[in-house]
């Protein structure tokens, strides 16, 4: 099973942001991920790795990932045919604003 690691800057107080993203991933993919690890760091780091592949780096990608895009990326790696419900709908479809 895949592993996700979220490296965050503890000096920047990004623990809550990284814990929220971990919670979102675990809530959606509880049976599909072996773990979501939180790794404290320094120097403004905020990086998300999926099985050793860097999928988001704050400095490289500019800012923080949208949780919708993060979940869709993980879904596409784990189970591309899986419906994420409202996350897969675009504005104007039934059930969306």
PLM ranges: what are they?
Residues 1-97:
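Domain-level signature for proteins that mediate thiol-based redox and metal-cofactor handling
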């Amino acid at each position: 099973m895949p592993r996700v690691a979220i490296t965050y800057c503890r000096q920047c107080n990004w623990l809550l942001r990284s814990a929220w993203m971990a919670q979102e991933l675990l809530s959606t993919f509880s049976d599909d991920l072996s773990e979501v690890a939180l790794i404290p760091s320094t120097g403004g780091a905020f990086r998300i790795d999926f099985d050793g592949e860097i999928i988001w780096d704050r400095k490289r990608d500019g800012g923080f990932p949208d949780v919708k895009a993060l979940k869709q990326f993980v879904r596409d790696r784990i189970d591309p045919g899986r419906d994420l419900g409202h996350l897969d709908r675009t504005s104007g479809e039934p059930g969306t604003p």
